Amino acid sequence: MLNSTIPARIAVKICGLTLPEQAIAIAQMGVSALGFITVPHSPRYVSAPTIAEICRQLPPAVLTVAVVANLDLEALANLVTTTGVQALQLHGSESPEFCQSVRQTFPNIVLIKALRVQSAATLAAIPAYASTVDRILLDAYHPQQLGGTGQPFDWTLLKALHIPCPWWLAGGITPENCRQAIAQTQPQGIDLASGVESRPGVKDLGRVAALLSNLGINANHSLYPEGSRF
């Protein structure tokens, strides 16, 4: 439901990290979660060994998220074991039934299902996932890209919509519009990739700092730590 207020607590996930030194630096700024894209054709792709290297150096309070698309259970198990991530973000065409299988197979993994919003029909699918996943992530639709487009979807589609589980907003969020995005849509968290980059996979730490400053988040005051099952 739309209103003009900012929630008292908001999670911030920075996604599309590829450089260990940047991931460690951003984790120390007070973000809630870091996302690592494992889809090979993505310009933000990062290998499992690099993800594992990063995860070993992060505090457990920072949720580590592997972003995947249409992997089978065996591949997911190998990824979780190899990297040590705390969460899986299913960003492909995974069905509610498949998400249930993932939940049963990985009961201790935080499970996020991304939906790429093309129309109100996309949002109608949310209830089918809500009882299985820990978070829904609503992202902008693009016919060739799974995310990181830098474009928002039509936020007015969320007007008066009841989402029956915690959810995060993605797509076209920047340090400049983050407060507007949160006030207008009222998510529990926001997810940024291109909005804080100098180029795909390389973050602009100054823009990350500006984002967190605009939201009143710092290294000693992470408003919504996500690094445990919720």
Curated annotation (Swiss-Prot):
- Pathway, per UniProt? Amino-acid biosynthesis; L-tryptophan biosynthesis; L-tryptophan from chorismate: step 3/5
Question: What keywords does the record list, in alphabetical order?
Answer: Amino-acid biosynthesis, Aromatic amino acid biosynthesis, Isomerase, Tryptophan biosynthesis
Q: Which CDD domains does this one have?
A: PRAI (cd00405)
Q: Does the keyword Transmembrane apply?
A: no
Q: Which domain of life is it from?
A: Bacteria
Catalytic activity reads: N-(5-phospho-beta-D-ribosyl)anthranilate = 1-(2-carboxyphenylamino)-1-deoxy-D-ribulose 5-phosphate
Gene Ontology molecular functions: phosphoribosylanthranilate isomerase activity
Q: Where along the sequence do coiled-coil regions lie?
A: none
One of the Pfam families matching this protein, by short name: PRAI
Family matches, as SUPFAM superfamilies = Ribulose-phoshate binding barrel
Assigned protein family: Belongs to the TrpF family.
Protein's recorded name: N-(5'-phosphoribosyl)anthranilate isomerase
- Gene source species: Thermosynechococcus vestitus (strain NIES-2133 / IAM M-273 / BP-1)
